[in-house]
Design a protein with these regions (language model features):
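A conserved regulatory-domain signal marking ACT and ACT-like small-molecule sensing domains
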Residues: 8-153
């Protein structure tokens, strides 16, 4: 009984936060941010990064032991992001929402590959519309080919 109460208290106190970073990419940005997270000994629950035309987009979901720890963490992350020229947005995630996300882990996934010399917005709109019309959600979009030079028009 006492273990259940203490476990519930720990779950009540901890916070889960999505940190979304964006800005010009250059070496050591991710390392610099991860060093701040490491100083606060948070758990990394999810991470994703993409760089498009030298612009970084990085998302990190962290678990912090308490609201007080989260406040200090967010302050330090905000200052570090500012120091290295990135914008950061903090989004709280409820335990219910996190558990729901985790429970979707075993769901079927599909890969759609679009082949063309040059991809147009019209083509991508058609494919994404078909995906949405079938009740599916897009988890990621990736260009698999080399970069498209403009002189090949």
């Amino acid at each position: 009984m006492m273990h259940d109460i203490s476990q519930n208290l720990v779950e009540f106190m901890r916070e889960i936060i999505l940190m979304s970073f964006s800005g010009p990419d250059r070496p050591r940005l991710s390392a610099s941010l991860m060093e701040v997270l490491a100083q606060h000994a948070v758990n990394i629950l999810d991470v994703g990064q993409a760089v498009i035309h030298d612009q970084l987009s990085l998302g990190v979901v962290v678990e912090s032991p308490s609201a007080q720890d989260s406040a200090l963490l967010m302050k330090d992350v905000l200052f570090r992001a500012h120091d290295i020229g990135l914008l950061v947005r903090f989004t709280p995630i409820t335990l219910e929402s996190y558990h729901q996300w985790v429970s979707g882990q075993g769901k079927a996934r599909y890969i759609v590959t679009l082949l063309a010399r040059k991809i147009t917005a019209e083509q991508l709109a058609a494919v994404t519309r078909i995906v949405a019309d079938n009740g599916l959600n897009i988890d990621g979009l990736n260009r698999l080919s080399g970069r498209v030079p403009l002189e090949d028009e």
